[in-house]
Design a protein with these regions (language model features):
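Short beta-strand segments
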Residues: 59-61, 88-91, 140-145, 171, ...
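Accessory alpha-helical/coil subdomains and C-terminal extensions
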Residues: 199, 204, 213-216, 224, ...
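N-terminal glycine-/serine-/threonine-rich phosphate-binding loop
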Residues: 1-57, 66-79, 113-135, 304-310, ...
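Conserved phosphate- and dinucleotide-binding cores of soluble alpha/beta proteins
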Residues: 135-139, 147-208, 213-246, 254-260, ...
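Internal helix-turn-beta structural module
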Residues: 384-477
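Gly/Ser/Thr-rich active-site loops/lids in small-molecule metabolic enzymes
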Residues: 158-176, 253-269, 375-405
Length: 477
């Protein structure tokens, strides 16, 4: 019996990619993590009786913050929310909406991933709420990707402008998220466990912040009178390192000021691009630094969503559509153009083989970087658009009739643009040829957006209210 014709590759690309993103949307993840009724509250397997609890403080930051906070209020219900909840969450400006008791504060404009004065104002409010915690209160911290830029709280001697300058320098120099956040933590009162230490009635204990606890029940009495802090985390970092996601506001920071200085040295940081005050503060801190004591076991950090969850859901959808799935993992990093060329070569290898059945779907995740040059900075684009454009250069001579690929940020953002990423198929290539667009020229200028916009290759989703790095789908028919 003959197989019916496959649907257009573009339709399948979008269906598979969307299935991955839908699986990590904040409301879905929150419903899996939190359950509540009139008698009790359960968070990631740990249960408290409402009769044992005072206030429920909700604080946090990130691109998924609005979705997480809104879902939490729905789970709790209006009566409990009105009686128990007070909260403040810093989110991108385009995510702000009205909730009953949790303030969603615009900590930065959409598409501007750096600290702002509005973010600083919100961070001070978050610190105030944290310090007001009583032994009978419970604190839920909602953390997701983008939280670092949304939680600026400079240490003494550093201004907000200094933080902005060092952030811009490292991002434009190709620093990894781990390197960027290592420096951010050493310049912040919130990051690197600072928020946990700000929580009222929390004392230094004998157990690390990321140590799992068995469900205890019995409310906060089981915590020896200390405040209970539970961080619900949607990871946007390869390997889910708790100290790097949003710069670990509730996780012990084991890095040192000297490591931050070494990172700045690696990228050739110096005044005026990085203010002298940054070096002065780090040098002074390095001279008096000693290994920190562990945070108490009354602080719990739980990853409720990550890139692997998105990949799994995308794979399931691909199988439904009749594809054999090959997963290339969630840890694809490196320079975006190189990652794109390698993905294209893998597509060609799959097309050339006769030992494995087709159609095939290649899935991968991660977060590559783009090295900007002085001439590239005014252009428009992002890492995913750059990746797909590089793949086109590798594939254009081989033909694209039976190959298509898509790379997009699960947060709906790709660089300082309104696109989540880009897709490539024969239609995009043919349109580029008809417009006489040279992909190599646009790639060298880091201007991929201007290439894909007239070709119909941009992936435009708007904010997805989640963030688990990037998701890439390649189809070979």
């Amino acid at each position: 019996m003959n197989r019916p014709p496959l649907p257009p590759l573009r339709e399948d690309l979008l269906s598979i990619w969307t299935a991955g993103v839908d699986a990590v949307r904040a409301p879905r993840l929150m419903r899996q993590a939190v359950q509540s009724d009139a008698r009790q509250l359960t968070v990631c397997g740990e249960t408290w009786l409402w009769s044992d609890l005072g206030r429920l403080i909700v604080i946090g930051a990130g691109k998924a913050g609005a979705g997480m906070a809104g879902a939490l209020e729905e789970i709790l219900g209006p009566e409990i929310v009105q009686q128990r909840v007070t909260g403040w969450v810093n989110v991108p400006a385009d995510c702000v909406r009205g909730l009953r008791r949790i303030t969603l504060h615009p900590g930065r404009p959409a598409g501007v991933n750096e600290p702002t004065a509005e973010g600083l104002f919100g961070s001070e409010r978050i610190l105030e709420l944290a310090s007001s915690l009583r032994p009978v209160d419970l604190c839920l911290v909602l953390i997701s990707g983008g939280g670092s830029a949304l939680l600026p709280a400079p240490v003494a001697g550093i201004s907000l402008g200094d933080k902005q300058a060092v952030t811009r320098f490292l991002m434009s120099s190709g620093a990894t998220i781990n390197e960027l956040n290592t420096v951010r933590k050493r310049l912040s009162r919130i990051k690197g466990g600072g928020l946990a230490l700000a929580c009222g009635n929390v004392q230094v204990g004998n157990q690390g912040a990321d140590t799992p606890r068995s469900p205890a029940g019995g409310g906060l009495a089981a915590a020896g009178g200390q405040s209970r802090v539970v961080s619900l985390i949607i990871s946007d970092v390869v390997g889910d390192p708790l100290d790097i996601i949003a710069s670990g506001p509730t996780v012990l920071d084991t890095s040192s000021p000297r490591q931050a200085l070494e990172i700045l040295k690696k990228f050739g940081a110096a005044p005026p691009h990085v203010p002298q005050a940054v070096f002065d503060v780090l040098e002074q801190a390095a001279q008096r630094w000693s290994a920190p004591l562990p945070l108490p076991d009354t602080i719990r950090n739980v990853v409720i969503g990550n890139n692997a969850v998105a990949l799994s859901a995308a794979a399931a959808r691909a199988v439904e559509l009749g594809y054999r799935v090959e997963s290339l993992g969630s840890d694809n990093q490196g320079e975006a153009s190189a990652v794109g060329r390698e993905l294209a070569r893998r597509c060609l290898a799959e097309r050339a083989t006769t030992s494995r059945p087709r159609p095939v779907c290649l899935l991968s995740g991660g977060e590559p970087i783009v090295h900007l040059t002085a001439t590239a900075r005014p252009r428009r684009g992002g890492r995913n658009q750059q990746l797909v454009l590089a793949a086109l250069l590798e594939l254009e001579s081989a033909g694209l009739e039976d190959i298509a690929l898509l790379a997009g940020g699960t947060d709906g953002e790709d660089g300082p643009t309104d696109a989540a990423g880009a897709l490539l198929d024969s239609e995009v290539r043919n349109q580029a040829l008809s417009l006489d667009l040279d992909p190599q020229d646009f790639l060298q200028r880091c201007d991929a957006y201007s290439f894909f916009e007239p070709c119909g290759g941009l992936v435009l989703t708007g904010p997805t209210h989640t963030n688990v790095m990037d998701l890439r789908v390649a189809l070979i028919r």
